[in-house]
């Protein structure tokens, strides 16, 4: 690699590449979430018959992973570059390897391995066949072919490619700590994110109000159900995301027992499943607008039989 791309140049390069492959460039969704998969641009769009090709950066918060900014590779918040293609292209792995070349990583000159790692997200009732992508011994990407999302079988199958941007940038820039990554010319990652890393870690582990969080979870759960009763999928899913983040804060604080933990996850999963079913039903009412006319006519005729 001759030129060491900055963090933002890595993002720009991936955006341009996947735009050229036919992906819409979405923006980060404005609710806390633990992974790019939980964005409605993946979770909702992976279900139902309509095609969907999108790419976006997603800041992902995992309160239990915070380390006060003292760990060089473990973060309260990291950034994922998410690519979702439905139906999955037959050459998705080749497309991915070509994206690495755009970043200056020649697959012929490096040890790139696809290590089987089937994926599951119990809190959203989602699972799929998956692989971790290892670059010279370091995981940089997760590949998943969704089989189930929100408890619904996916058809057509959606392919998801999730780049870990901090890990990728650490490799490209040859630094040992994420805080030494050059975000932009003359600006280090740590100069932007070290302070919030420390503060969010302190809040998550020491300061959060457990009673308030428990109360909020109950309120968010009820509001999600209330929105679903009116067929309001997106407001309901926003509250599912709020439930998930609130649970993650409670978990980081040690406020839930092992038994309670399973119960909270089941409550979030049940809501997510209703959201998924309602989303498909509402898209059907709209006539699945992203389908081509011929496919739409056939599908709606079959459903009407």
From Swiss-Prot:
Xref: CDD domains: GlyRS_alpha_core (cd00733)
Main subcellular localisation: cytoplasm
The protein's Enzyme Commission number: 6.1.1.14
Catalytically driven reaction(s): tRNA(Gly) + glycine + ATP = glycyl-tRNA(Gly) + AMP + diphosphate
Top-level division of the source organism's lineage: Bacteria
Keyword presence, Ligase: yes
Name of the top EC class for this enzyme: ligase
A single cellular component GO annotation: cytosol
UniProt KW keywords: Aminoacyl-tRNA synthetase, ATP-binding, Cytoplasm, Ligase, Nucleotide-binding, Protein biosynthesis
An example molecular function term from Gene Ontology annotations: glycine-tRNA ligase activity
Subcellular location: Cytoplasm
Example GO BP: glycyl-tRNA aminoacylation
Record carries keyword Cytoplasm: yes
Pfam families listed in its UniProt record: tRNA-synt_2e
HAMAP family (UniProt xref): Gly_tRNA_synth_alpha
Quaternary structure, from the entry: Tetramer of two alpha and two beta subunits.
Family listed: Belongs to the class-II aminoacyl-tRNA synthetase family.
Name of the featured protein: Glycine--tRNA ligase alpha subunit
Species whose genome carries this gene: Streptococcus pyogenes serotype M49 (strain NZ131)
Lineage, top ranks: Bacteria, Bacillati, Bacillota, Bacilli, Lactobacillales
């Amino acid at each position: 690699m001759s030129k060491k791309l900055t963090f933002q140049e890595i993002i720009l390069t991936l955006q341009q590449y996947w735009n050229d492959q036919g992906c819409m460039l979405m923006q980060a969704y404005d609710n806390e979430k633990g992974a790019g998969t939980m964005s409605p641009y993946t979770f909702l769009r992976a279900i139902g018959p309509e095609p969907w090709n999108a790419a976006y950066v997603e800041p992902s918060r995992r309160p239990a992973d915070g380390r006060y900014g003292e760990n060089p590779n473990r973060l309260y918040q990291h950034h994922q570059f998410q690519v979702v293609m439905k139906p999955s292209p037959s050459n998705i792995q080749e497309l991915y390897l070509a994206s690495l070349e755009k970043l200056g990583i020649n697959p012929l000159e490096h040890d790139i391995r696809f290590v089987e790692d089937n994926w599951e997200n119990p809190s959203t009732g989602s699972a799929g066949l998956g692989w971790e992508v290892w670059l010279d011994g370091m995981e940089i990407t997760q590949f998943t072919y969704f089989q189930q999302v929100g408890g619904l079988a996916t058809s057509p199958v959606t392919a998801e490619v999730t780049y870990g941007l901090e890990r990728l940038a650490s490799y490209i820039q040859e630094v040992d700590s994420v805080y030494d990554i050059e975000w932009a010319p003359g600006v280090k990652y740590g100069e932007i994110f070290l302070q919030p890393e420390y503060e969010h870690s302190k809040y998550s582990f020491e300061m959060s109000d457990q009673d308030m969080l428990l109360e909020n979870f109950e309120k968010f759960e009820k509001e999600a159900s209330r929105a679903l009763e009116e067929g309001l999928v997106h407001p309901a899913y926003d509250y599912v995301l709020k439930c998930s983040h609130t649970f993650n804060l409670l978990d980081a604080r040690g406020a839930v027992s092992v038994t309670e933990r399973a119960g909270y996850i089941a409550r979030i999963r049940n809501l997510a499943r209703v959201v998924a079913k309602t989303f498909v039903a509402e898209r059907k009412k709209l006539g699945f607008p992203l389908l081509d006319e011929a496919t739409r006519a056939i599908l709606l005729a079959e459903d009407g039989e």
